[in-house]
Amino acid sequence: MNDYVVVIPTRNRYRLCLRAIRSALTQTVPPAEVFVVDDASDDPRYQWIEEIVGSPRLTVLRRAVSSREETGAGFAVGTVRNEAIRHVLKIGFSGWVAFLDDDDEWLKTKSAVQFDAVGSNGRYGVLCSNAFNRDPAGVVSGYHHGTQGVQITDTTRDVTAICRATNPVINSTAMIHSKIVERLGDQQAVGFGEDWDYWQRASRLTGIMRVEEPLAWYTVGNPKEYTL
């Protein structure tokens, strides 16, 4: 049940990427593997990221051509994630695929809380949660969904229908089962809103459960690269 892998796209944000990787590897329910996709970074430190992290559960997939060059439409983070998604399907992994942007960070119990919430309920093939908004200086400014200080009465929420009108899924908290990934195919390089496009399509195939407890720090106000 708790078998999952993590996909982290990155470009030229080495220190932030290290933080994201470590937050995934140190989960109380650890992932089977963390896949980092380097989108042709100019930073030479990415060459040694496996050695610096020192975990056999880390795999770095390196793109020779950046998504910007490939698509001609800015940084297409979905295109970068697809590298890992295809790899996961190719090796026959059966379980959950979790997404984490390189400037975001998980709380240590993030995966455990989500798995406890869904239990054996086969209705939900996508899991997500609330998150704390945090600026690049580390200042927390509130909840991403709702208002900080307001009591959340529901511990979980079915957000499947909401996904048709707005995006209730914070991508860096999302897990999707590999069975749904296979049916969805690639994330589409549609520019702004490609995350929402992915979850909209997923909502037609499966239920989406959101844990209302914040389980990640979501970076706002960072102008570089992959903040969507």
Q: Predicted segments — roles?
A:
Residues 66-91:
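Glycine-rich, basic loop-to-helix element that forms the pyrophosphate-binding segment
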Residues 32-40, 61-64, 101:
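Short beta-strand/loop segment that forms part of the nucleotide-sugar
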Residues 22-31:
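Short, acidic, metal-binding catalytic loop of nucleotide-sugar glycosyltransferases
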Residues 93-103:
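Short beta-strand-to-loop acidic/aromatic patch adjacent to the donor-nucleotide binding site
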Residues 78, 150-228:
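Conserved nucleotide-sugar donor-binding catalytic segment
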Residues 38-49, 65-67:
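A conserved acidic beta->alpha catalytic loop
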